């Protein structure tokens, strides 16, 4: 679903305890190393290791923040009304298995690189829980931290455009052949009908 299709009035998803921990860690890094940009892959691994080593008492403050945010989210969702027609979305066209794979967005590339790390910290989380966590982390990132993923998305878009052009170029001759074959069959059928009339 594109950005234009998203409902801006929908309440922001609740943050997990770990997301608050990562947020605090990023703020701490910014204070201690103001001129050092965050290398997200390394930073994510470091946060994961520190969270695992943190005692439950230390995690308590982050769980409290998460619970308060859950209360906020539940309250906002009670008064939220989705736009009309959202439940009756258009049916997607059947995909051609030979068509090029769609290009990935920056967020999808980010998710692919960080999904396993979240799963290792929270092995019992569902796919939906992990997706929410990824979304929360993505929103918390600065524009500078997103640059590597934006570049990856731009490169993949170039790949898709090129592959799509080649795919369409191959598809045109095939459509022409099908059309010609259909016309030929139609002519043969007319010819047979005509012969039949003459014999009568």
From Swiss-Prot:
Belongs to the HMGB family. It comes from Strongylocentrotus purpuratus (Purple sea urchin). The keyword DNA-binding applies. The gene is HMG1. Gene3D superfamilies: High mobility group box domain. Residues 190-200 have a biased composition (Acidic residues). One of its GO terms (molecular function) is DNA binding. Keywords: Chromosome, DNA-binding, Nucleus, Repeat. Residues 11-81, 100-168 bind DNA. Binds preferentially single-stranded DNA and unwinds double-stranded DNA. SUPFAM superfamilies: HMG-box. One of its GO terms (cellular component) is chromosome. Residues 64-86 have a biased composition (Basic and acidic residues). It is found in: Nucleus; Chromosome. Residues 64-103, 169-200 are annotated as: Disordered. This is High mobility group protein 1 homolog. CDD domains: HMG-box_HMGB_rpt1. InterPro entries: HMG_box_dom, HMG_box_dom_sf, HMGB.
